[in-house]
Amino acid sequence: PTGWQQDSAVVRFSGGTDTGTSLPDWSAAPGDYGSGIHHYEYSINGGAWTGCPVGDPTVTITAGGETTVTARVVDGAGNASGQTATAKVYIDPAPPNVPGITLSTEQWTNSTVTVAIKDNGDAHSGVARTEYSLDGGSWTTYSDVLSIADHGKHTVSARAIDNVGRISGTASKTALVDKVAPVISKVEQQPDSGHTEMTLAVTATDADSGV
C-alpha cells in the first residue's frame, strides 16, 4: 500500500454532529446539536475504545506495519455514534535487510568477474531499489549484472533503500582480477652433479595472485 511513514503518524479526528447517527469525517468542523459532542473515541485494530478530548483530537501511531484506527463521537449524555470512521496507517520503523552480493568467483582469476546483487526484502514498506559502489565511488542504482575486467583488487559494496527512504547496512565483497604475468628476475644453472640432465633455478614474482 501507499502512504507509508517512517517513524510515526498522527491521526486527527474531526467532524460529527449530535444526531445519534453521524460519524467523524476526518475533515469537517464538529457540530453542536442536542447535548453536544463531548469527546471522540478511537479503537486500534479492533481493541478497546479510548477517549480523546475535542480540544486535542489526535492519536499518534508508532507501531510498525499496518494499523487500523476506528473513530466515533460521543455526546454529552454519553451516547456513542452509531456509525464509525476508519483509517489505515502504515509505519515503517526499520531499514531494509542488507542485500546479498554474488561474485562469479571469489578467487584470483585472469577473466572478467561478474557481480550480481539481490535485495533481501523489507519487512514493511518494501525495497524501492538497490545501489552499488565500486572501489568507494559514488552510489549507483543497480539494474543488471556488473562486469569487472580491470586488473587488481576491486571492492563492490551494496545497499538497499526502502519506500520511505531508509537505507540498509552495507554488504561488501572483493573481486580479484590478475591480468599481469609473473616477472622472472633470475635464472641459474645448478652446479653440475654429474647427471646428464641440466637443472635450472628460476626466481619469479607476482605482485597479485602470486606464483
Model regions and ranges:
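Low-complexity, disordered linker/stalk regions enriched in Pro/Thr/Ser/Gly
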Residues: 1-211
